[in-house]
Amino acid sequence: MRAVGIGKVLGVIGLIVFLWAAYLGYTLITLTPQIRAEWGYVDEKTIELDVTVYFGKPLPVSINIEEADLYWAGIKVGTLKDLKVGFLKDSARGVLVLKNKEIVEALKEHIRNGEQSNIEIQARGSIFGIPIMRGSFSKPLETDLLSYISNITIESSGDLIKTPAIEGMPSKWGKIDENGIEILSDVKLYNPNPVPLPLFGIKYYIDACGYRVAQGELIEKVVIPANGGGTAKIRTIVDTDILPKVIAEHIKKGERSEVTLKLTLAVKVLNREMEMPLPEIKKTVETNIIEQLNLALS
């Protein structure tokens, strides 16, 4: 009789396990998870993203994502730790910590690859304490960062001697190293004056969020003909050491930054050297990183 009783108990346990496994399989097959992120704590060293995963239904399993690493352009830029899914819970929360310095290094690699790279998440975890989960997810990323300066135009101004007009700044990436990112530009100039303008110097600055992020200089002297056009070649160096502060400030301001471009030409007019400050260009740069991230993860 005792053997029969034990058999019935084992049969009930087996039935429960079977039903649980069947429900778990059905749940996982029909699962439509949604991931939502929002900005958390931000400073010049780290950026925190509060991440919530909604499963749409209670999960009959206890899952612990021990660590999920975020890679950009092959460089680890952040880690999501201790994302736990409780038994029969329909959501889970965690914090993704991004390292600003590593983000800048990944940006350099992204540019080296022609502004093409992959964003990848590598995760490992356990179910009911058993470390059996391991997987990855990646999405391609393409940008066109130089378009922000390549299409810059500045009208001529002044009375007796007018400042040259800028009719574009086609640019390309140059040297990229630990000291910064180099941008090489061809400044298209038009001289509206009846006399030629020998150009022997350019002061070129880009400020963002109150920080000087880049400055440029003339590579070689050029003469802009009277009532004609010419091209001035300039080299701009982006200070990557300051970028973590700019990134943090941009996020703190709701992903909104004021960017100012200042350009002064050093020319010679009637054998007299003089500087010609051009009108400043101010632009508001807005991003929607969180929105794009949520769309990519949903």
Task: Map each language-model feature to its residues.
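Extracellular/lumenal and peripheral-membrane lipid-interaction modules
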Residues: 2-298
